[in-house]
């Protein structure tokens, strides 16, 4: 048996020999991640369903990495990554938190812990934009849950590791959860799970119960157990008995899976290992797992119990061993597909073959009460230096950078440079009003003021494709308590939507009402709390309401403005479905609206105006957003899925100094085009939700009657709940895969056995059905109580946004009457 302390694996090198282990201290608590070579950097996101243990796992990672001196606890509200007051009081993650920390002395992990609640989907979307890979955390009791399915789809192209958490809980099943993983994500694909470690249960001397106490390391053939009295101690044992048998079978299954895709491993297995599974080296297995994980052919699976400090260090090892570095990940998506991109092993992503071209994406803005506005950025190419002159290719503005920081959740570490692959923070007065979420920043890697050295047409016009913002589905009216509070309310709202672009503001010109729109009830509840308690807005709120939209079903007239001093603009509005599919389009906020700019004669020539094209473009975009927010003729709801087309004959005076006049001209043209459109050319749209219901079979009839009748639902499918037996080992076979994957059986305790027997006896009368449907959001805002009544409290459901659909004539008047 070997026993050692692992309190500071990040600042220590652990050497294992046959008879001894030595720990060599190597340094500082904040080992700078800026010093790590690109090949040793990992940009990861932690994603999962709410309450699967994302933040708990992250806190253990920070403890074992040496970042924190004690283990943060969600329940007591002292976590590092959940540092907002609302997060600590509610015990949930509300916004994504970024933190950088070292591991194993040489690796740097940039981690983003994301929310699990569906209302904060945008936080996951923008995190996925800048990470290279994911750790998916699954609840061993609940299996694959609804939000896990959603984030898995959203992160489809990202390499992943799965960590099955809460293995210490009553009802936990490694077997069921792995099978659930296969059935929901891998059936019909070529992707397979590879069990890197499996649970180890120890039988209690005073009962027949088994307690989860560690993991069996399948790659190295060892048993790891954690001392419950000392979170810093891991005990390593040789395998015997059932543990050895399970490990051998898992190792054989692992090698069979890997050799299906990896010819190098096939050759090693046949020649060097002589066809003996036990002789395949751990080094070769790790290399094969890494190679195939990065190709999305396999998903390594590990397990543990983060709250009990079990399995976290092996998970950290898997992150650095199997997930890609920035020079092995996907290349960024640029607006100009003709610009060459490749990875250089020394400098990372190389754009336009220019080592001095630095490109970064601003993916998040926060307001710190002390430091002011801070912008999270991901460096994709080149080097960003403090004090550099930066060009915002999204807005056309130039400015000088202030301080650079590396984020540590609620704190940060000052640095002088940020290199390709890093996630960092920008602060200072110069960035406050010059950067928003989704902006692309460009600078020279080695010159403080080297923008003139970059190609004006090919490099300074580059943009990383914008972050998708889903449309809001709920709204709440907001007004100042007194007229003197109006300005502070507007400033607070502006701060709020700058930090969270999935919130939006709409105004009714007729009533003067201001509406704050968001992704769900909890989303708006948090926003209201922030407005009042953090931003000190003295306001009153109305009732929660569904966010309806309007759209047009035909093109407007072309409206033209021409002046003697050189301004000329012609534009029209049309439904998105009528827009040309390959035209150059710019997104307009959160409502699926677009600006189409046709090329004019000056487009490809030397730019002759004093203001940049980006400044002109952003003024037009701002006027378009205002014009579309004014709403349609049915009920003044904001317009949705519309394109504004600016004809190619547009021009501005050569001596134009500011784009303010352009904003006014285009806004008035939009108003005129919409005013001239007949009322019957407008349609009312409502949010439609995907509804997943799990109910007893005996209640299917009454629930279906309620859905199709009172709730106007469209039933998509009715299926038996997917269930997998937990008694005994199993093999699962994806329909596209020929080899079978061994999954060890779960240890059975006395309580489990009694529960299983009871469930078996009740099966005939308690079969669960899953109903999938589409239903208008308006009809299920109070569905929780209704379903509880219909199913005697045994039903549960999840909803997520599907799309906006035209309101049918038979429901239109009812909706308008209730407004």
UniProtKB/Swiss-Prot annotation:
This is Ribosome-releasing factor 2, mitochondrial. The keyword Nucleotide-binding applies. Mitochondrial GTPase that mediates the disassembly of ribosomes from messenger RNA at the termination of mitochondrial protein biosynthesis. Not involved in the GTP-dependent ribosomal translocation step during translation elongation. GTP binds at residues 48-55, 113-117, 165-168. GO terms for biological process: mitochondrial translation; ribosome disassembly. It holds the Pfam family GTP_EFTU. Transmembrane segments: none annotated. SMART domains: EFG_C (SM00838). Keywords: GTP-binding, Mitochondrion, Nucleotide-binding, Protein biosynthesis, Transit peptide. Residues 39-327 form the tr-type G domain. It is found in: Mitochondrion. Residues 1-30 form a transit peptide. Belongs to the TRAFAC class translation factor GTPase superfamily. Classic translation factor GTPase family. EF-G/EF-2 subfamily. One of its GO terms (cellular component) is mitochondrion. CDD domains: EF-G (cd01886), EFG_III (cd16262), EFG_mtEFG_C (cd03713), mtEFG2_II_like (cd04092). The keyword Ligase does not apply. One of its GO terms (molecular function) is GTP binding.
């Amino acid at each position: 048996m070997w026993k050692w302390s692992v309190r500071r694996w990040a600042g220590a090198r652990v050497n294992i020999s046959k008879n001894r282990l030595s720990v060599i201290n190597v340094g500082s608590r904040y080992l700078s991640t800026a010093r790590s070579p690109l090949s040793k950097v990992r940009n990861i996101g932690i994603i999962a369903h709410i309450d699967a243990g994302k933040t708990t796992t992250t806190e253990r990672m920070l403890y074992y990495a040496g970042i924190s001196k004690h283990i943060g606890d969600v329940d007591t509200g002292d976590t590092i990554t959940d540092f907002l007051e609302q997060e600590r009081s509610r015990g949930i993650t509300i916004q994504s938190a970024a933190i950088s920390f070292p591991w194993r002395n040489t690796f740097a992990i940039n981690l983003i812990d994301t929310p699990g609640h569906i209302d904060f989907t945008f936080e996951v979307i923008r995190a996925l934009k800048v990470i290279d890979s994911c750790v998916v955390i699954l609840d061993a009791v609940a299996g694959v849950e609804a939000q896990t399915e959603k984030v898995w789809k959203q992160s489809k192209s990202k390499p992943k590791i799965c960590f099955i958490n809460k293995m210490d809980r009553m009802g936990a099943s490694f077997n069921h959860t792995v099978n659930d993983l296969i059935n929901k994500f891998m059936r019909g694909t070529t992707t397979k799970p590879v069990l890197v470690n499996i649970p180890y249960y120890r039988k209690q001397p005073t009962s027949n119960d088994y307690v989860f106490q560690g993991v069996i390391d399948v790659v190295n053939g060892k048993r790891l157990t954690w001392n419950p009295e000392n979170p810093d101690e891991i005990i390593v044992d040789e395998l015997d008995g059932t543990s050895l048998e399970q490990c051998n079978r898992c190792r054989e299954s692992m090698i069979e899976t890997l050799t299906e895709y990896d010819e190098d491993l096939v050759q090693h297995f046949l020649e060097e290992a002589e066809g003996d599974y036990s002789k395949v080296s751990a080094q070769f297995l790790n290399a094969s797992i890494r190679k195939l994980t990065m190709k999305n052919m396999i998903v390594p699976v590990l397990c543990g119990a983060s709250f009990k400090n079990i399995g976290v260090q092996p998970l950290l090892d898997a992150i650095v061993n199997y997930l890609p570095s920035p020079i092995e990940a996907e290349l960024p998506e640029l607006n100009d597909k003709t610009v060459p991109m490749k990875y250089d092993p020394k400098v990372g992503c190389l754009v336009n073959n220019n080592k001095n071209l630095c490109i970064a994406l601003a993916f998040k803005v926060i307001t710190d009460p002390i430091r002011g506005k801070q912008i999270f950025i991901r460096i994709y190419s080149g080097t960003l230096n403090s004090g550099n002159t930066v060009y915002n290719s999204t807005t056309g503005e130039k400015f000088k950078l202030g301080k650079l920081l590396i984020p540590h959740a609620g704190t940060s570490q000052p640095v002088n440079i940020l290199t390709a692959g890093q996630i960092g923070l920008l602060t200072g007065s110069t960035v406050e009003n010059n950067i928003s979420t989704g902006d692309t920043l460009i600078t020279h890697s080695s010159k403080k003021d080297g923008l003139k050295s970059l190609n004006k047409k090919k490099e300074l016009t580059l943009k990383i494709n914008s972050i998708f913002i889903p449309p809001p589905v709920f709204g709440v009216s907001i007004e100042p308590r007194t007229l003197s509070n109006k300005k502070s309310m507007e400033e607070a709202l502006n701060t709020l939507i700058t930090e969270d672009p999935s919130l939006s503001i709409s105004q009714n010109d007729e009533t003067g009402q201001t509406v704050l729109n968001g992704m769900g009830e909890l989303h708006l509840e948090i926003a209201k709390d922030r407005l009042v308690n953090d931003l000190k807005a003295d306001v009153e709120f109305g009732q929660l309401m569904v966010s309806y939209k309007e759209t047009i079903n035909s093109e407007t007239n072309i409206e033209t403005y021409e002046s003697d001093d050189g301004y000329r603009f012609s534009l029209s509005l049309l439904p998105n479905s009528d827009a040309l599919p390959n035209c150059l389009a710019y997104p307009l906020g959160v409502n699926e609206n677009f600006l189409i700019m046709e090329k004019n004669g000056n487009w490809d020539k030397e730019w002759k105006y004093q203001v940049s094209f980006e400044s002109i473009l952003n003024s037009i975009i701002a006027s378009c957003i205002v014009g579309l927010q004014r709403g349609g003729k049915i009920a003044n709801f904001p317009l949705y899925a519309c394109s504004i087309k600016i004809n190619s004959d547009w021009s501005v005076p050569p001596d134009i100094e500011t784009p303010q006049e352009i904003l006014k001209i285009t806004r008035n043209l939009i108003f005129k085009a919409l005013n001239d459109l007949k009322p019957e050319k407008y349609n009312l749209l409502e949010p439609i939700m995907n509804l997943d219901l799990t109910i007893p079979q005996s209640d299917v009839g009454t629930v279906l009657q309620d859905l199709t009748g009172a709730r106007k639902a469209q039933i998509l499918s009715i299926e038996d709940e997917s269930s997998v037996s937990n008694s005994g080992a199993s093999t699962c076979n994806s329909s596209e895969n020929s080899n079978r994957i061994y999954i060890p059986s779960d240890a059975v305790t006395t309580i489990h056995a009694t529960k299983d027997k009871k469930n078996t006896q009740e099966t005939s009368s308690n079969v669960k059905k899953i109903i999938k449907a589409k239903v208008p959001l308006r009809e299920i805002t109070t569905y929780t109580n209704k379903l509880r009544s219909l199913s005697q409290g045994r039903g549960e459901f999840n909803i997520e946004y599907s799309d906006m659909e035209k309101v049918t004539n038979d429901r239109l008047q009812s909706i308008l009457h209730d407004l």
